[in-house]
């Protein structure tokens, strides 16, 4: 009679094995965390106060990192935030070089993340459809 081994069972169905995460994904996650701390504690630019980092992607060779940001609040001043990030790029890269201990610090590209706007548009479309269905249901 064999003893039930949950690890063996999970491994046999593919749930127990830990999948390897690519280095570029780990570095992108570390950059996202460091950048969030920088925005909260060290960067004093008022244009970057209502900015949050939504996601960070890195190329496999870690030469380019794209940082997607969102702007919170009613005033969406994307061009001003782009200029502020461009001005702070050197400071951010030097901080990342010190904290991440990488041989080469990747080039940073800041991109406005339009996901929230697209979600709002889709929600409006769904609300319009629901309203039309409700109006048609009441009239019939």
From Swiss-Prot:
Name of this chain's protein: Ribosome-binding factor A
One MF term in the entry's GO annotations: ribosomal small subunit binding
Source species of the chain: Desulfotalea psychrophila (strain LSv54 / DSM 12343)
InterPro entries: KH_dom-like_a/b, RbfA, RbfA_dom_sf, Ribosome-bd_factorA_CS
Subcellular location: Cytoplasm
Coiled coil: none
Gene: rbfA
Subunit annotation: Monomer. Binds 30S ribosomal subunits, but not 50S ribosomal subunits or 70S ribosomes.
Main location: cytoplasm
Family per similarity comment: Belongs to the RbfA family.
Residues annotated as transmembrane: none
Function: One of several proteins that assist in the late maturation steps of the functional core of the 30S ribosomal subunit. Associates with free 30S ribosomal subunits (but not with 30S subunits that are part of 70S ribosomes or polysomes). Required for efficient processing of 16S rRNA. May interact with the 5'-terminal helix region of 16S rRNA.
One Gene Ontology biological process: maturation of SSU-rRNA
A cellular component term, taken from the record's GO annotations: cytosol
Alphabetic keyword roster: Cytoplasm, Ribosome biogenesis
């Amino acid at each position: 009679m064999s003893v039930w081994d949950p690890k063996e069972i999970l491994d046999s169905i593919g749930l127990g094995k830990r999948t390897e995460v690519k280095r570029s994904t780990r570095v992108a996650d570390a950059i996202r965390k460091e950048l969030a701390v920088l925005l909260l504690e060290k960067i004093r630019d008022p244009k970057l106060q209502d900015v949050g980092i939504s996601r960070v992607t890195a190329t496999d060779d870690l030469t380019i990192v794209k940082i997607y940001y969102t702007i919170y609040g009613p005033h969406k001043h994307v061009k001003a935030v782009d200029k502020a990030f461009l001005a702070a790029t050197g400071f951010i890269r030097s901080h990342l070089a010190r904290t991440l201990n990488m041989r080469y610090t990747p080039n940073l590209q800041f991109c406005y993340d339009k996901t929230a706007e697209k979600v709002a548009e889709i929600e409006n479309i769904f609300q319009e459809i629901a309203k039309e269905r409700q109006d048609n249901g009441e009239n019939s």
